[in-house]
Amino acid sequence: MAGKTVTRADLSEAVYQQVGLSRAESAALVETVLAEICTCLSSGETVKLSSFGSFVVRSKGKRIGRNPKTGVEVEIEPRQVMVFKPSNVLKARINGGHVNGLDMDEDE
């Protein structure tokens, strides 16, 4: 799947091929996992996936920004943002490195 954007359908197909569920069950599983992640994030919880990373909801306070075209100051309201922080294992795998003596390029 490298070199392209991976979609829900791609994830469902991977589950279908690797786990052996039906295509419908694979799609339902992917949707259930994504829905649970969304529900947790919506309620302000952190979602931590071991060896992958964490999805964290952060609060940004009110601040003064500037319109880049006009230079006029604008008040930016407080808001919630979602941030993904990759694990060291994922970072090493992306960079072709090793973690704790494991070759992250090999299939696990």
UniProtKB/Swiss-Prot annotation:
SMART domains: BHL. InterPro entries: Hist_DNA-bd, Histone-like_DNA-bd_CS, IHF-like_DNA-bd_dom_sf, IHF_alpha. One of its GO terms (biological process) is regulation of DNA-templated transcription. It comes from the Bacteria. The lineage of its organism: Bacteria, Pseudomonadati, Pseudomonadota, Alphaproteobacteria, Hyphomicrobiales. GO terms for cellular component: cytosol. One of its GO terms (molecular function) is DNA binding. Keywords: DNA recombination, DNA-binding, Transcription, Transcription regulation, Translation regulation. Heterodimer of an alpha and a beta chain. Belongs to the bacterial histone-like protein family. This protein is one of the two subunits of integration host factor, a specific DNA-binding protein that functions in genetic recombination as well as in transcriptional and translational control. This is Integration host factor subunit alpha. HAMAP family: IHF_alpha. Coiled coil: none annotated.
